[in-house]
């Protein structure tokens, strides 16, 4: 059960939670679309970043959507982006100039801006999902269960 009631506005359970204010829902959705479609960053890179952050933020709804990050560690751009995203999710105050130097080895300034904006937005979404208690049963697009994820954690 979520901590606040779902509104009548929005499509997904997440949207219904922020949909108590239609204007916020509308602008939130517009920003989400812009971040996913208005970028030259690879869609798989964005998805791996989203998955990485989901596990740090412990958002069940977000974790069961596609499971754990799944990429070849030789994919330097994805590896760099997910490492940065993980640090951001753990403690953004630890990020310093040297981390941006590492990002610059793989990304342009525009891409870094887009990546950081994406990470910030997704973090906000997932933290909201977590505090609202948006659990796995609300995720209609889940590909794995929390039970299965917990089993892989034990191995």
PLM regions: where:
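Hydrophobic alpha-helical segments
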Residues: 1-155
């Amino acid at each position: 059960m979520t901590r606040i009631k779902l509104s009548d506005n929005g499509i997904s359970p997440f949207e219904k939670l922020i949909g108590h204010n239609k204007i916020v829902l509308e602008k939130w959705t517009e920003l989400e679309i812009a971040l996913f479609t208005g970028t030259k960053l690879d869609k798989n890179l964005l998805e791996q970043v989203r998955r990485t952050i989901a596990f740090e933020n412990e958002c069940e709804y977000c974790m069961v959507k596609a499971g754990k990050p799944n990429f070849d560690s030789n994919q330097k751009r994805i590896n760099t982006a997910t490492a940065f995203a993980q640090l951001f999710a753990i403690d953004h105050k630890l990020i310093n100039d040297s981390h941006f130097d590492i990002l610059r080895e793989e990304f342009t300034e525009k891409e870094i801006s887009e990546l950081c904006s994406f990470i910030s937005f997704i973090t906000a979404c997932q933290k909201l999902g977590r505090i609202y208690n948006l659990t796995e049963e609300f995720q209609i697009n889940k590909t794995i269960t929390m039970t299965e994820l917990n089993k892989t954690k034990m191995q």
